[in-house]
Amino acid sequence: FLEDCQRLLADVANAEASVSAGGVRANGHLRVTAPAGFGRRHVAPLVPRFLAEQPEVTLSLNLSDRVVDLAAEGFDCAVRVGDLRDSALGSVRLADNRRLCVATPEYLRRNGTPRHPSELVQHDCLTLSSEASQTRGWAFRMPTQAGGAEVVHLKPAGPMDCSDGQVLYDWCLAGHGIAWRSTWEVEGDIAAGRLVAVLEDFAAPPNGIYAIFPSARHL
């Protein structure tokens, strides 16, 4: 997974170099935006290494769970986690992104373990607030009457929501409810027993982690 993340900044450098005649060495200032949690863990640590390899480049990193308008706000590249909606943007898929419902063992002992997504209404669900990027809710793979399966989006409620995914993660680790988080964030906690995955049989297929550019000419 780290290798996929390292490709991100290389893609940015190649994109900027490609708009120069003859593929001249990348130079100038890059503005990159990424989701706060993913950016802190996987993008920010790579910036110094990237700049060491590209000494004529400077870089500003914006971390926000808001969906940024690249063209209107002057960004050269965005990292997007999830489904892409704007087909006018150029994109490079970096890695798969799988999400799971997780909670602490203590929370599940107190409140029980949901066996079906419909039972989430009985639980304290920790959700991103409406101004964040997760507008469709939590995705689940549900059986159909025809014997197949379809992805259904639910918007569970709870006593707390936040626009910052790191806060939801912290609340979940503190035992305040069930959160729907990416495996890159919680797989270590699951392995260590700090968090337990629930409703795994209903987990939706993975979507993607992408590098997004204002124009396909960068690809």
Language-model segment annotations:
Residues S18, T33, S60-S64, V198, ...:
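Solvent-exposed beta-strand sheet faces enriched in polar/charged residues
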Residues R31-T33, A78, L126, A179, ...:
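Short, well-ordered beta-strand segments
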Residues A72, L84-I209:
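C-terminal regulatory
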Residues I209-L219:
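A bilobed periplasmic-binding-protein/Venus flytrap-type ligand-binding module shared by bacterial periplasmic
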Residues N27-S91:
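Central regulatory/effector-binding core of bacterial HTH transcription factors
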Residues A10-T33:
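Short helix-loop hinge/linker segments at domain boundaries
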